[in-house]
Amino acid sequence: MSKLNIDQKTVLDLFSSKKSDFLIPDYQRPYAWEEDELAALWDDIVTFAIPHDNAEGFDKDAEYFLGPIVTFRNSEGKLEIIDGQQRLTTLMLLLRAYYSRFENMQDPKSIATRGDIEKCLWKTDEFGSPDKDQLKIDSEVASDGDKKEFLSILETGETTSQNKSRYAQAFNFFAERINKFIDAYPSFTPHLAMRILKNIILLPIEAESQKTALQIFSTLNDRGLPLADADIFKSQMYKYFSDKQQKDVFIDRWKKLETRCTDIFRKSRSNPMDELFTRYMYYERAKQGIRDTTTEGLRDFFEKDSYSLLKDDRIMGDLEALANFWNRVDSQEGFSNRILRRLFVLGYAPNRMWTFLVSVYFLHNRDKEGQLAEVPFYDFLERITGFIWSYAIFRPGVNALRTPVYPAMIEIVNNQEVTFEDYRFNRESLQNQIHAYQFTNGRPITKSMLIWWAFQNPNQQLLDNDLKLDIEHIYAKKRAQFSGDLSDTSLLESLGNKAFLEKRINVRASDYQFAAKRALYRGDSGDGKKREVTKNQELIELANKSDEFTETDIKIREDKIIDSFLDYLASNRLLK
């Protein structure tokens, strides 16, 4: 069982301890606190330490809990910070700004305060005197070009007009706030400093290893910036490329890759670089022939054999190529129109599995320029669309989809055609399931089906990936509620009564009779001014064809959608 050292400590107790020799490791992210976070911390501290603007009203036993600091002691005896580096860095800058004000003061309280702050910032000799050449914290953040500025500020207590880093901004912020505080409450100045040192509480958690520390971190509800798996991977790759004398080249490539991924995967719930590594992981899994549907975690997969997969010259090239591919998908460039249409539809898939399949396909089949052969790629996209859509109805849940998809990934890297031969659907059975399925708006497959259907229309134009689309009830719910002319109100949630519609138009159209909806679809305002026209070609055609949409129309349209979908599956050899 892992051993942990957990002991609540004040800032002074933790920072001044001779055992406290902190290291911000190379896999951590650069300092990121901005003025909002700094102001919130400062205001909280002042409110706590000087209650109701009265230093004498402070309870000396009061405590202000700032959060945990998760570390482990590395092979060099330094405490590597896994969680809490943002707040720890901020406290160091705050204390250094305070120290600069006390540096030349000679009254007893100021001398005592200065002495305590010195023990927090610098290592001391056996007599307790600070060695100002040895800070209590060091930084090795690989992608942080400003780390030297951070260490310089701690050493000198000064910034210049040339210093533009977050560290300099934080130091200057605290210096300014301290000056204002001294002007307003000159007699309270030492009190505030001592209460920061002796009444702000941290919870240092020292684990016996990096892995244990990371596991602890993942369970904590952190106020700071979460450490991503990709940060750990960056550390391993940084060491590998440093040993090959390619450190600076690696850092530059990593920064560019990180910037690109932040833009590409802006909608992702996970860290953008984690998203890229996840998509790459499925390629490596396929090459290893892994069919097991119990997918291990991202870090668990890559840490095997001491991160051997990451210690390879080709890794950065593969990641860059994969990011460039998804950038082209996102920007809708570099593909034929028919492939862009398929990719747009897949963007509304009921789950993310398609992105893993397509990533494996790209990495295995790309040419030297990162291009894919048009015809086989289009056929592949067509088939996985039909299969993923059908499986979401036939056997809902992404976990179930792993069973047929993981073997398909292995087929890709073995140069075999993906056919899903063992998982083809019975037409009649699937037809009955689709008719019985409740296509409520809360189910992702509902919008998936509607987008697929819209793009079966050859006149449907390609849409921007960032366009916000809602689900429109063509026969309005309010109309059914007040008119009572639907014999079966469940038809309201039928695929035959739904279509995608731009959010801005949907807000206006939601409660109208179809005659009024027609005008909104076509952009007719009634006052002669033209408004936004829907980009849903089918709705335009419906609006131009009739001034009514009835129960019969719902049923006819539902049958048409379902029959067309089944024909689509048949054309892609997905039916028995």
PLM segments and residue spans:
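Secondary-structure capping and boundary motifs in well-ordered enzyme cores
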Residues: D61-A62, I82-R87, L192-L197, I205-T212, ...
